[in-house]
Amino acid sequence: MASIQRVAGFDIGTNSLRVLIADVDSLSRIVAGLRLGFAVRLGEGLSETGRVSETALERTSRVLGKSTLLARRLGTSRMLTGATHALRVATNSAEVVNDLEEAAGLPINILTPEEEAYYIYTGALSDSFFTALPNAFPGASPGTSPVAPPPASPGGVASTGAGATVGERAFEGGFVIDVGGGSTTLIEGSGTGIVRSSTLPLGCVTLTERFLKHDPPASEELRALGDHIMTELSRAQSLPLSQVRPLLLPEAQVPVTGVGGAVTSIAAVSLGLPYYESRRVEGHILTRDEIEHCAQQLSRLPLEEREKIGTLGRRRAEIAVAGAFILSLLTCHLNVRRVTVSTRGLRYGLALEAAAHPAG
């Protein structure tokens, strides 16, 4: 019987705080877990002021404190945090980290873009022999809920979708896209790890605040948003997209996996779900046409109508248009015809890293 340790990963993003409390066996498989997501919007107003606001910090500190308390109550042996774009660029990052560390009672790690890419990659393509933790989660803030695990496929192995390890079959290469609140990460990988990656300043929160001032967005705002996205895509240096594009041609058969709240939200909208179900979203294949249709559909709706889409909710509805435009233009630019959606990502990679270095 493989030994089990309970660990936790905390993804402190520009839009969301995502938590995974997981049981990991000696083969680095996540065998049970509790997933939580909170739209704390740490980066609210950051693109305009360059600072994390007091309101956003208080909101994030409160939720992070409750989440780490929950993890301790559930008996985690080690917890690992990873903060991304917002804390990399905020001018008051040091004081924000101090406050978050006081609330959480553990170190806050500001990840470099390379570290973020590594944890996204290992998390998105991780083994997922996954069942829900039986424990309730007392003390969580209103609006918090556990997310159901992926459905089991024949033989008891959780369905992982293209690009993931399934049973004894090793992942042999692929491409991962993470559209986040403050940045978009592109990762080219092989069976032995990351070949190269690039983090672009294209985030749902930052682009919404910068370009989309009207409700619904004006046509000139959408054009400016699209032009900006295409300009940034053409500037990618560490992962030149002109070199990536041939890898993604249909004959190359390189799997493309999409992670992050923007991608999973688009999948849920495309599926027409009345409410978000990770069981349905996990492994769903989004075509380029579906993504473009979703972007156009959302851009025509006022916020009040977007909020009525059960899979979005108010906070995601506010930034859904920018997220859909980023993914749509990225897939067009790279000639990607389909994206397999993964509900895993950075928090999974952090949890696996915590398990790999247990407390002494």
Task: Describe each region flagged by the PLM.
Residues 138, 142, 146, 150-153, ...:
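Low-complexity, Ser/Pro/Gly/Ala/Val-rich intrinsically disordered tracts
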Residues 2-7, 21-26, 45-76, 85-94, ...:
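Helical "lid/coupling" subdomains associated with nucleotide-phosphate turnover
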